[in-house]
């Protein structure tokens, strides 16, 4: 090596590791099945893979008044409303009774919550079952009230696809059930646990270097 030659430290040549993805499970309760329908509850949890199981790091829930949905131009689907009337009393009251907010505030609060979860350069993963339902309806509601969303179409992940892949890899554990079905937050919690358990299972199948 000449006097002008020098070697860079190995660490300087290696890219800095990316921060882990911010994983969020989203669940909506609605009065329709198409974009533009009324959103009556938004539930979400931030979850992570830790040790032998998942961990819930943060939670979000807003229930929304129908009056505000109507004022925003969101519609009510009669068959969906009739379906709600057949659900257990606890599910109905958890969504349609108690303290509720308007759809403007709900969309603003949710997008701010998602934005505040992020870290610089940390990828965002928004999970749903399926995203074709929750993503499109949530984005339509946000658009109706003029709230920009802090995610792109590549940020969404499909729990149903993960379920199929894990099953093909031999996953057979029973699913975690929500403490109260059709409660947006309870559904999001259960779905987060089910996603995390499958992700951990698939990780265990990857050969160690």
What are these regions (language model features)?
Residues 27-29, 134, 158, 187:
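Acidic active-site catalytic centers that drive phospho-/nucleotidyl reactions
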Residues 2-15:
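Charged, flexible boundary elements
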Residues 150-170:
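Short, flexible loop segments at boundaries between secondary-structure elements
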Residues 114, 118, 132-154:
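Substrate-recognition/cap helix-loop segment adjacent to the acidic, metal-dependent catalytic center
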